[in-house]
Amino acid sequence: MKKILVIGGGMAGSIVANGLARKLNKEMNNGLIEITVISATDQHLYQPGLLYLAFGRVRENELYRDQKDILDKRIKFHVDPAVNIDANNKKVTTESGKVYESDYLVIATGSRIMPQSIPGLSEEAYQFYTPDGAREMRDALKDFKGGKVVINVNAPHKCPVAPIEITLMLHDYLKENDLLEKSEITYTYPVGRVHAMEPVANWAAPEFEKLGIKAETLFNTKEVDGKTKTIISEEGTKLKYDFLVTIPPHKGAQVVEDSIEGAKGGWCPTDKKKLYLEGKTDVFICGDTTNIPISKAGSTAHFEADTIIDNISSLVQEGTMARDYDGKVFCFIETGKETGSYVWFNYTTPPNPGLPTKAVHRFKLAYNKMYWLSAKGLL
């Protein structure tokens, strides 16, 4: 029997496990393949929905499903966080002390926010990357009466267009609640334009200007002074705020940083086409966990998962890998309360954001409902 072990029960891990169960359906039914998923939690969270939770536009319980209900019934599922990954031998030790062995290992441990890496940021800034953070931001917005709003972007971070989305949605929120005239919005970004991807920056900059949103580029956050309500950059720029929102810096999982050689910042050194751990053709990396210099997004995880599913199933059935990952990424961009845009790109095609429309916004809302089919690997 061949054993496939998936570390991580998020979008990437769920799609890989479910996709392999379908591709290797006959082998599973005949007892030739065993698929196991280990996770730190028994709940599956739709992370993009946290952006809507921060504005009170979705109920929190709509963002969760039981992880066991997401997975194919034949997949073994254990809530037992990994504490050590032995990539050389494809073994994983968990918090309970159990050691899981495998023939093929998939590492899909995701990323974590690190606001604590910048003095004062955790204490002063709101963020929407965790349920607690989104809830706190929602509640604080209800009490906000206007003033200086600063959206502070740090790198690296997941969801490439999240900084643009939160800024435009905040603008519409203030307008809808008659607070725009009493407020001033400033957006900070660490490089010399409003987004790392130049075509996105070229699209967003005039949108900001049209809406009266100030942009402070080359702003690498040094610290936040809660006493004076000031955020300070390494370059020496100081901005006053009454309401501070941050896109916090991210790192990969601690277990990856501790276990995998060369995994600086918790990002695994990954072959950009075959998606295996460099030097290990039977250990695959999916989603935020890779160190590939492309956007960390749900769609990235999905497209990578499709490649890994094809390659592992082909290795099992034919002894060879099936195809390459082309770097494809697709992201919706919420441009306000009622309009949306999108952007897609890959290793050879640069992004080119479309014009915001109500139709794209509605499609995004529809996808929010259909996400669970994606996690099950049905979309």
Describe the role of every protein-language-model region.
Residues 1-76, 156-198:
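Beta1-alpha1 glycine-rich phosphate/pyrophosphate-binding loop at the start
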Residues 339-379:
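C-terminal auxiliary extensions adjacent to catalytic cores
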Residues 172-175, 301-327:
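Internal hydrophobic alpha-helix adjacent to the cofactor/substrate pocket in enzyme cavities
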Residues 121-145, 238-306, 310-314:
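FAD-site-proximal beta/loop scaffold in flavoenzymes
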Residues 313-352:
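Active-site-proximal substrate-binding core of FAD-dependent oxidoreductases
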Residues 1-3, 75-165, 172-176, 245:
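FAD-binding core/adjacent interface of flavoenzyme oxidoreductases
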Residues 32-36, 75-88, 92, 175-270:
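A Rossmann-like FAD-binding core segment of flavoenzymes
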Residues 9, 96, 109-110, 235, ...:
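Glycine-rich, N-terminal phosphate-binding loop of Rossmann-like dinucleotide-binding domains
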